Amino acid sequence: MRKIGILVAAIGVGMATSAAVEPRNYYGKIGKRLADSLQKYHVLQQPMDDEISRRAWTNLVTFYDFDHSVFLKSDLDRLAAHELTIDNELGEENISFGYDIYNLYVQRLGERIGFVTNLLAVTKSWDFSTNETYRIRRKDAPWPETKAEAEDCWRKRIKNEVLVARINHDLDKSTNRLDVATDLIKRYRQYMTFMTEPDEEAVLQHYLSAVARAYDPHSDYMSPASKEDFDMEMNLTLCGIGATLTMDDGALKIVEIVPGSPCERDGRLQEGDRIVGVQQDGGPMENVMWQPMKKSIKKIRGKKGTKVILQIIPKADPTGTAKKLIDLVRDEIKLEELAATGHVETVTFDDTTRKLGYIYLPGFYESMGKRPNEEGFRSCSMDIAKCLADLNAQGVEGLVFDLRGDGGGSLREPVLLSALFVQSGPVVQLRDLRMVGSLPIPPGNPIAFRKPMVVLVDHTSASASEILAGHLQDSGRAIIIGDARTHGKGTVQTVMGLGPEKYGSFKVTTARFYRITGLTTQIAGVSPDIHLPSVFDQLDIGEESIPYALPSSRIQAADYRLSWDMHKYVKELRSLSEKRTSADEKFKKHLANVKGMKAIHDREEVSLEYAARKAQMAADREMRELDDEEDEDDEEKTEAKKRRRKRNEPKKNDVVLEESYKVLMDLIRMKGGEEVPEVKGWWY
């Protein structure tokens, strides 16, 4: 019988829970205003009825216990009393259910984590020789009938985590001491802190978001704090100290320091230092150990020009005996890792060398609350126009525009981006509650880039990405390359306030958008001209997999003409690409990786027997490493990934990008130096 010993630290086995969270007295008014506003502005014009109530109830239960392992069946029976009454309760300004379910969740989670800490403290060794399995996907499993049944689920969960740690240790051939129990107790303590210490505003957000998403998955409630985060992401700016943070043993660990930030200019804070206290606005030093990360970060952020004092445990002295205080003046931080970037790539293929442009766009951003002519206004179309000017100056012969992983953003930006490549005509059609109309490229538009281009997409490219890719494809301006289809989001959201600032805002789906052909991207997405799959290609992560997604539809095509003639080259380009990739050993390995990731994603159950699981994990690890860095040790890999993240560069050995460059080279050769012609007039 094979048994594996685990070192156990002397850690307390009890797990205290927080006091019950209660709503503020005006929160009921927020709930009623949201309910009224959703009925008034949502594109479906659906009343707040029993069906919406049922959906909201399901959303909330799923949010708190997605894998059916915290609540008991008896809890669900009790909660079911509200399944068809949420609509009525909101109309009466009653939001107590949102707090009742949260407080019950905290109670049950405390019991589960208490069981985990006790189990880890008393278990001296684990038996991994028995033919036992662990169900890793429980979203369709019945809720446990009894406490004992729930604890058995958690026993298997912990046994699985211990086994995974042990096998990884063995596969790495590590000589380091393995202390799984201590690590897991710390992790679950942090998880308990994260889930059980939100304030009353966060609980309100969870509840009202469940209500909004009952209409469709992209409608949402935003508390004042969430709206602030949303604006920061769209503006690419925040006011703070300029450090990327993560939780580490209860403290905020500095992972990375933003170039040009107060942290970098001051020079005293270093990567690896841990923040354990924050003093702001002349107040007392507040202990932030084991606080939810969002709360601690909110204390560190603040108005530009104000001072914050941090209590630090230096990386050089992790014992904490040499704590020190560091005062910093907050400043505006540019979130450059979210901005568009471009560079020139020199590519040699078939004895021909060409300079090609590459642009990566992680999101469709624009400054919120500012007009384009105001100082400080920034948008992705402005940044990409600068990139294109630079690429043109360097004499590139074509462009790869990378939209992989781009989840969208501003609706206006894909129209302005299309105008950089297409001279005139409609870009996208919108249908709202009143009418169907088009968003066109303004007349007299000068094209910024006239040379051949390909656009890269994947299954996570969504919304504004799909508008841009779909328009460039439909107008014959670009060749689309990537996964079998994009995400499939074809709806437009509008952000509105709910009254006083403390009431927050809501995001509501007010329109659907359609391609100029009349087809929708809703559910269907954008299909590529050349299918080069990523690891996301076969995963169930598209719009159709999200509860309550709106159905697809179509409308009449807009009045448009082709801006160029890319379509006639697709068949030959596809044939050449298929011939290359079918003979390319590296691409064959990549395709095996795609299939392997699908198998891992669909896996419902895993073995808890050591030998069988080790063989499976070794095979999974080998498959995952197929597309990873080559010829780099671990430290070099980490640094390379950091550099790429800062510059938004694609990963090394990106076989899809490599083949896309070759497709672009083929296209340039076929076009024979031809560029997009200038056309006089408004419509083609």
Per-segment meaning from a language model:
Residues 31-43, 81-85, 186-190, 362-368, ...:
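Acidic/histidine-rich, surface-exposed loop or edge segments in extracytoplasmic proteins
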Residues 20-127:
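Charged, amphipathic alpha-helical regulatory modules used
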Residues 119, 136, 170-186, 516-684:
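Conserved functional hotspot residues or short segments at active or partner-binding sites
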Residues 62-63, 84, 103-114, 124-160, ...:
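PDZ/PDZ-like domain segments forming the peptide/carboxylate-binding groove
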Residues 2-8:
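Sec-dependent signal peptide recognition
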